[in-house]
Design a protein with these regions (language model features):
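Short beta-strand segments of immunoglobulin-like
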Residues: 24-28, 140-143
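Acidic, turn/loop-rich segments in luminal/extracellular domains of secretory-pathway
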Residues: 1-17, 29-35, 39-51, 61-135, ...
Length: 189
């Protein structure tokens, strides 16, 4: 053995640790385009200074239409997302929910720290609050015997409502061409 003691110094090179994210739920509105925000995609990384650089869509939307802007590093406008497309920011993703649907919409994503994607994919759920849809109607014909009073009822009017709400009132927009139309309890009276 040597007469003196020596110090052996070992240096370690840092390696990138993959980032993580978390499942999240955001609120949207029926029949309304929803653009996501950066805050909708949680990002955590033990490597100091790392930040989210990409979001990759791994499983497509369960319903509706998910679109990507400037996907895969390009400069194109809004296009349909396909599996494994990535965007640089949460604001580069938007969802058009299915018409008249309040169903939750889910898709899966991974986050990237500039070097690697997260090891796991996470689910983003968009809930939708209902909005009242206007009812629809159509022209209708009521047959009657000449010189006989007609009393109209709700069933005489073609009516449809996507929420299933029963007819509440009728608004006359054009007056009769012949005869006398009388209203009972008009204007809420």
């Amino acid at each position: 053995y040597s007469a003196s003691a020596y110090v052996l110094t070992t240096t370690h090179s840092a390696v990138n640790d993959a980032p993580t994210s978390a499942a999240a739920t955001v609120a949207g509105t029926e029949d309304t385009l929803h653009t996501y925000a950066a805050s909708n995609f949680a990002f955590s990384d033990v490597d100091s200074g790392d930040s989210i650089s990409r979001i990759k869509v791994t499983v497509l939307e369960s319903t509706g239409d998910l679109e990507c802007q400037n996907k895969n590093g390009g400069s194109a406008g809004w296009e349909d997302c396909v599996a494994d497309d990535y965007v640089e920011a949460g604001t580069d993703l938007r969802l058009t929910p299915a018409s008249n649907s309040v169903a939750d919409v889910t898709f899966s994503f991974m986050v990237h720290d500039g070097t690697a994607y997260s090891a796991a994919a996470y689910v983003l759920t968009t809930t939708h609050s209902a909005v009242n849809d206007l009812p629809t109607s159509a022209a209708a014909t009521v047959s009657n015997v000449e010189d006989t009073l007609i009393t109209y009822a709700a069933g005489n009017f073609a009516y449809s409502d996507t929420e299933g709400v029963a007819i509440d009132q009728i608004k006359i927009t054009v007056l009769e061409s012949t005869g006398d139309l009388e209203c009972q309890n008009k204007n809420g009276g």
